[in-house]
């Protein structure tokens, strides 16, 4: 894959060079202690440290702590634990005093956290020494305003958006989406119709989104957005019909029909990114209008690789030329993208997976986007680290002043397909100071009783 990448780089350089713009001096540095060179930092061998004992990454110097081990998931002992699948869910409370992880069996397990000492603790209501089992499905999202509040859905009422308040332990309905007037109607109690678990919330807590209507993920056809003042608004991706209690009604501007894999609300609350399940790329719905725009997998918009929604922008890997070729584009003009890393590393490396998270985004989309990179297990074992930014946790400058990459740690993850939990998917806190990620620690955690690879959740301090 690496030799092939060099050829792709030479062929594509002229095409892509028109979009390179971020050069020059570094802007205001948010991470003054981080390494920002582009040198190769090989990985120092290290045994998995014990849980809840802070340590220092030997290669980049960042403070870290192991958050989970085989005993953490008391609902399913000896099983894997992981972070959110997308980087879009907000797994940190607004004040960094709490976070949650996902355990095998679809359980949400929440902990207390001391940002000063990185000490992990049990929350009120939990058995001492254990996590608190939160009665929401995976991919729940903390409020960006209220650190006591977590939004999601339950297995028993998947068409109802609920909130969980930690101080009282109360689970309360926020919206029964069957009352939103979708066409055709969603029917409460119909066990053949569920929602995805992708509940997202705007930065001001005013809007919440969900995708729903199918039998399972990938078969949904409704995106429903709830405005706490105005009410519901919905879009049926199979018929193209848009309706609700506010805004214009009628047919979406796109003629494409498709089923939904996931849908993610922008932090502004004005847009929803919709991942289709028919490999058409993704769509963006301008919620207050009938405008739905496709960012196609084909063509020159480079929309195919993993990405993340910000306030009013979208950042994604280009999936072209080089692994660190990361693009930023406004959600209201998807073909107008800028290259965040310039010049690109040379010689180029292509084939590394790149996942991003941007829960720290501000209203101008100018704060760093963070992420992790990883190779498939067989490639990692064959090549090891041969290029800068491989198997790392990092953040990238997005303000247009420069192309700084802040480097924090090796993630020590070995992706073993098809075991999703072996990917080092990350989740950054609202203040951009902590990064939660999944790792099997170079395979040293071993297998479970069925022979499947284990993984745990780790925290690195970004400073």
Predicted features by range, described:
Residues 55-83, 88-95, 100-129:
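Beta-propeller domains
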Residues 82-95, 131-147, 191-204, 253-268, ...:
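Structural signature of eukaryotic scaffold interfaces centered on beta-propeller domains
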Residues 99, 150, 208, 272, ...:
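Hydrophobic beta-strand positions that form the internal "hydrophobic ladder"
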Residues 125-215, 236-249:
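Asp-box/WD-like beta-propeller blade repeats and closely related beta-sheet repeat scaffolds
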Residues 420-463:
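Blade-level signature of beta-propeller repeat domains, shared across WD40, Kelch, NHL, RCC1
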């Amino acid at each position: 894959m690496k030799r092939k990448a060099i050829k792709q780089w030479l062929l594509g350089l002229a095409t892509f060079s028109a979009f390179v713009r971020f050069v020059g001096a570094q802007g205001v540095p948010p991470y003054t202690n981080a390494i920002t060179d582009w040198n190769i930092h090989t990985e120092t061998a290290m045994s998995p440290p014990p849980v809840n004992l802070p340590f220092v990454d030997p290669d980049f110097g960042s403070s870290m702590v192991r958050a989970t081990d085989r005993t953490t998931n008391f609902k399913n002992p000896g099983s894997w634990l992981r972070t959110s699948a997308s980087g879009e869910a907000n797994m940190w409370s607004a004040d960094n005093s709490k976070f949650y992880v996902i355990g095998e069996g679809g359980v949400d397990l929440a902990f207390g956290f001391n940002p000063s000492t990185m000490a992990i603790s049990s929350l009120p209501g939990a058995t001492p020494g254990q996590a608190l089992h939160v009665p929401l499905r995976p991919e729940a999202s903390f409020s960006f305003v209220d650190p006591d509040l977590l939004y999601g859905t339950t297995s028993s009422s998947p068409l109802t958006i609920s909130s969980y308040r930690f101080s009282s332990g109360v689970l309360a309905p926020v919206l029964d989406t069957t009352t939103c007037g979708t066409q055709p109607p969603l029917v409460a109690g119909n066990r053949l119709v569920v929602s995805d678990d992708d509940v997202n919330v705007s930065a001001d807590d005013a809007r919440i989104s969900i995708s729903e209507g199918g039998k399972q993920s990938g078969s949904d056809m409704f995106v429903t957005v709830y405005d706490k003042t105005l009410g519901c608004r919905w879009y049926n991706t199979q018929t193209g019909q848009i309706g609700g209690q506010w805004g214009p009604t009628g047919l979406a501007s796109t003629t494409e029909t498709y089923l939904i894999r996931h849908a993610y609300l922008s932090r502004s609350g004005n847009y929803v990114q919709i991942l289709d399940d028919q490999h058409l790329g993704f769509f963006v719905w301008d919620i207050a209008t009938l405008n739905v725009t496709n960012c196609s997998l084909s063509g020159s918009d480079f929309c195919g690789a993993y990405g993340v929604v910000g306030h009013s922008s979208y950042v994604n890997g280009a999936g072209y030329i080089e692994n660190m070729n990361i693009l930023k584009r406004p959600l209201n003009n998807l073909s107008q993208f800028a290259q965040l890393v310039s010049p690109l590393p040379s010689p180029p490396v292509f084939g590394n997976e790149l996942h991003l998270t941007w829960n720290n985004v501000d209203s101008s989309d100018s704060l760093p986007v963070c992420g992790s990179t990883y190779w498939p297990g067989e490639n990692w074992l064959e090549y090891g680290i041969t290029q800068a930014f491989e198997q790392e946790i990092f953040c990238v400058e997005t303000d247009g002043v420069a192309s700084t990459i802040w480097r924090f740690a090796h993630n020590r993850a070995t992706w073993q397909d098809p075991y999703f939990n072996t990917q080092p998917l990350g989740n950054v806190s609202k203040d951009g100071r902590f990064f939660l990620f999944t790792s099997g620690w170079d395979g040293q955690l071993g297998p479970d009783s069925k022979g499947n690879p284990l993984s745990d959740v780790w925290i690195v301090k970004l400073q």
